[in-house]
Amino acid sequence: DVVTVSRGHFFRLKAHQERFARSCARMKLTNPFEAEAEARLLHKLVAKTGLRDAYVWWTVTRGANPRVPADRLHPDRFTNRFYAFVIPYVFIKEDTDRQVGINLMVSRDYIRIPQNAVDPRAKNFCSLDLNMSLMEAGASGAHWSVMTDGNGRLTESPGSNIFILKEGRILT
């Protein structure tokens, strides 16, 4: 998962942790830390950096494959691993770009990974499609990309949420 820290304060850390726990359950991963210990660890990492505005990333991986090939069929036979890092917060676009807007391109060459391939309700880092759509946008002179599903519906933008103002209503 990813959470931001602004002026020394985490943005909705508990909500991010709850989403992370749901994602782990959907992916059959076991977080080696309880929520309180996880929060203490993330706070400690940020404190060690001295950053007041940061991007905090953490994940649980399946871990190395068990030695016995048949054990790969059983999620409980893996030793899941927890990783986290903190880096300075970086805006995707500069203030001037955010004030006037940017040129978005709906990707023609790439679609978002279908939900029957990777459950979109589980936060994951399957991002090759997102990265390729960014390169497509750059090659076309656009500032950023938006992806669709296999039926042409907007899904997401790399590192961004999509909000549409239509007839006075905000859609997401």
How would you describe each model-predicted region?
Residues 47-59:
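Ordered, amphipathic secondary-structure segments that act as subunit-interaction surfaces
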Residues 1-44, 61, 70-172:
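Helix-start/capping segments and mature chain N-termini
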